[in-house]
Amino acid sequence: QMLTEMARMSLADGLVMQIHPGSLRSHNPRVLRDFGRDKGADIPTATDYVRALKPLLDRYGNERDLTVILFTLDETSYARELAPLAGHYPVLKLGPPWWFHDSPEGMLRFREQVTETAGFYNTVGFNDDTRAFLSIPARHDVARRIDCRFLATLVREHRIGEDEAFELAPQLAYHLAKKAYKL
């Protein structure tokens, strides 16, 4: 399997592997014809992580020197597949909401659906690979505000203490991404 071979090479090179599945590219042929690729005619699709990642996880799932960061456009997989996989396999981390879900409500849905099973430390906080360079500060500000909103809700509901929320906030804003990407 190609992903398993890529994981082997990432481990050998000390690199972090990212997987971004679930987009049917250039869905609208007229937009593709008239304007070319990457013009907004991409559509999220369902993704089967459990079966698709099985060969990779059988071989490298418990490898502590490899990090595989999973992103998704299929929000239905957060609680059903991604959180349980990341909670079980040390190699896996969950990337933040991406593309269509890179929005305040999308970020909140992510936290609500993955935290119970995967916890906070099996995610990578917020990272950004946008081509819209000037939007990066605003996007990170939104992510920090949503994470703090989520933590405040947990404190209000007495699910975590205020001191724990104060410890988690800088982890989510900075330290988890730095650690996941070995920076």
Task: Give names to the regions the model predicted.
Residues 30-36, 89-93, 123-130, 151, ...:
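Short acidic (Asp/Glu) and glycine-rich catalytic loops that position anionic groups and cofactors
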Residues 12-16, 59-64, 88-92, 117-121, ...:
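Secondary-structure transition/capping motifs at alpha-helix termini
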Residues 27-36, 78-86, 104-112, 133-149:
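Histidine/acidic-residue-rich catalytic or RNA/ligand-binding cores of hydrolases
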Residues 1-77:
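Divalent metal-binding pocket/active-site signature
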Residues 18-22, 69-73, 94-98, 120-139:
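Short acidic/histidine-rich active-site segments
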Residues 120-121, 138-183:
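Mid-to-C-terminal alpha-helical segments outside catalytic/metal-binding sites
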Residues 39-45, 98-103, 138:
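Short, contiguous acidic/charged loop-to-helix segments that flank catalytic cores in large enzymes
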Residues 23, 58-66, 71-73, 82-85, ...:
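Acidic, glycine-enriched catalytic cores built around paired aspartates
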